[in-house]
Amino acid sequence: MDSFLRLLIHGASGRMGQSLLRLASEDPSFQVTAAVVGNAPHRHVSDGVPFFAAAELAAVPAFDVAIDFSLPQGFSSLLALCVARAVPLVSGTTGLDSRQHEALVMAGARIPLVWGSNFSVGMAVLVNLVERAGDALSGWDCDIVESHHVHKQDAPSGSALTLGEAVACKGIAPRYTSLRAGDIIGDHLVQFTGLGERIELVHRASNRDVFARGALSVARRVVGRVPGCYRVRDLM
């Protein structure tokens, strides 16, 4: 039995994909057997990693787990491949539509599956803190402000929506503000405001590696699990 996990990285040309490629290559518990990019003219090998165009996804070699940070239009094909091959999937692709989220739930009946808007340890802690604050601050206003780089398309961010769900389940309706500026990696502020006082909970990411490390950690832990839809914090 191999001492490493064979890893497929889907969305390897993106910012997160590049971080995953670099960190996985430095981690002896992984071997990248395929990197899938949307704009590759044909399959090729770079630094020992086989690259495949998105159109060639069905031809990728065997893998033990897939990590996906891509775009919604490429997500469904990867999900179908993982189900067909009975392989776990870890995905951080945001902006999915309702049908894709339904497909995620259905796939969770057949494979171990983790979808998360944010894979940092700090964000997992923030979600927990926000839930606890929601329990204690019924009747307070809640505002969620998220800031990202100018190239991020979806708004509010997936992480902001996750934070909003954490308070919405406590009966608090959050308001969202989205900022797109410069090269901000990701800032999230959750503000609870009452009469004469307010509480602010903040998470700031200064490096994408925190998300990539978290995704790799989750990928290690999801292999061998029974089928199901797991949360990031379930495996942190």
From Swiss-Prot:
The keyword NAD applies. The keyword Transmembrane does not apply. It holds the Pfam family DapB_C. NAD(+) binds at G11, A12, S13, G14, R15, M16, G92, T93, T94, G116, S117, N118, F119. Belongs to the DapB family. (S)-2,3,4,5-tetrahydrodipicolinate binds at H149, G158, S159. Its EC number is 1.17.1.8. One of its GO terms (cellular component) is cytosol. It comes from the Bacteria. Disulfide bonds: none annotated. Keywords: Amino-acid biosynthesis, Cytoplasm, Diaminopimelate biosynthesis, Lysine biosynthesis, NAD, NADP, Oxidoreductase. GO terms for molecular function: 4-hydroxy-tetrahydrodipicolinate reductase; NAD binding; NADP binding; oxidoreductase activity, acting on CH or CH2 groups, NAD or NADP as acceptor. It is found in: Cytoplasm. GO terms for biological process: diaminopimelate biosynthetic process; lysine biosynthetic process via diaminopimelate. Its main location: cytoplasm. The active site is at H148 (proton donor/acceptor), K152 (proton donor). Catalyzes the conversion of 4-hydroxy-tetrahydrodipicolinate (HTPA) to tetrahydrodipicolinate. Pathway: Amino-acid biosynthesis; L-lysine biosynthesis via DAP pathway; (S)-tetrahydrodipicolinate from L-aspartate: step 4/4. It catalyses: (S)-2,3,4,5-tetrahydrodipicolinate + NAD(+) + H2O = (2S,4S)-4-hydroxy-2,3,4,5-tetrahydrodipicolinate + NADH + H(+); (S)-2,3,4,5-tetrahydrodipicolinate + NADP(+) + H2O = (2S,4S)-4-hydroxy-2,3,4,5-tetrahydrodipicolinate + NADPH + H(+). This is 4-hydroxy-tetrahydrodipicolinate reductase.
